[in-house]
Amino acid sequence: MFAKEVYIARRARLLSDMVAAGEKGIVLFLGNAEAPAQYKDNCYKWRQDSSWLYFFGLDEPLYGAVLDLESGEQTLFADDVEIGDIIWMGPQPTVLSRAESVGIRRAVPYGELDTVVAKALRAGRPVHFLPPSRYYNTLKLAALTGGAKPSEALVRAVIAQRLVKEDCEIAAIDAACDLGYEMHTVARDAIRTGIVEQEIVGKMEGLTLSKGWGVSFPTILTQHGETLHNHLHDKIIEPGKLMVIDAGAESNEHYASDFTRTYPTGGRYTPRQRDIYQIVCDCNNFAFSQIRPGVAYRDVHLATVRLMLERLKDLDLVRGDVDAMVAEGIGGLFMPHGLGHNMGLDVHDMEDLGENLVGYDPDQKRASQLGLGSLRMARKLVPGHVITDEPGIYFIPALMQKFKDEGLDKGFVHFAKLETYSDFGGIRLEDDVLVTADGARRLGRQRLPIEPDEVEAAMTRL
């Protein structure tokens, strides 16, 4: 948790922005409740709601809060533990002491939330709340508000605030990236033919647990990189394969890191693997060189796809005018995802609030084209944005066949050559990037080895 002044300032700005936008009424926040796996005493791993963490910092279940836009009054709703709870949990701080730790002076029992919201509704006052991501809060909000819809004004205000990271947030993300570096180093050093992929996943995730942290999302580790988010780890590691590892750590403050590297299972890339790997590596470096304030990340995506197609043309996998290929969406055959996404308290930051609202400026319209349509972050960049830079090239047999059968290639794809890559898999390379006043910097103290010679040197030292 940060100093209480951080949370006081965040809530003050939110209230100020909402009032400046002409909004009235109350702002209602709900923290998460525990989610039972089978029964109420055996729950899924606890994770607090990210917007709750941002404005209140309290990392325990069943909290609520109301901010009054007219009076400025702030109230925390939660229940103090009783003797039955103390027997199982031990002594706990009072709700009031927890409220005071984040700069709130008034704390009342959780049950009074119903009364406060009902009173506001009877008086005709708007009740602003965010879209819930958990079933308990969905049901609770429906009961409290009579099925009212989330407040778009509040959603936009929260997005505007959370998109630009404060110094304390950047420090937390840097720390998460440092542990992410260690995770990937442990994984790279553990790659051996003949072992099961899960052994490597266990070492990576065990490292985060040994630090008292956790992972920022389920680890992706696979020799089938053509499946973009393959969470199965049951394969024996074979020689001559490419292993995609997409993983990150979550800091004690719940900020994420998200790195991807692609390793040769035998320690050296084959000539064909190196050709494709170098293209992806160059695209990653090129994209980073384009990141700076005032540039739309959509334009960086398109420029990176153009470079990728130029290089694939050099390998005779595509033929024709590269600009026409970009316009026709041929890049989506090889990279059917966007260049990157926002990152912060969520690894895909704030997507529970609406992916288009988070990733697109009001004057930007999301494309329907394969690849570009999956771009999660298209906005014009400003200092304080934290984004990922993650180009990839994938040879997906089913997608290749679809392009061929339906003529989606528009005559640009050299299928006779492309089909020789059907067993290739995929390559993705991802760094986490902070937009600065005059450009960008990669987050974390050091960058994971990425150039093919660097990767091979690191693997052959073992």
Region annotations inferred by a language model:
Residues 1-462:
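Active-site neighborhoods and metal-handling regions in enzymes and metal-associated proteins
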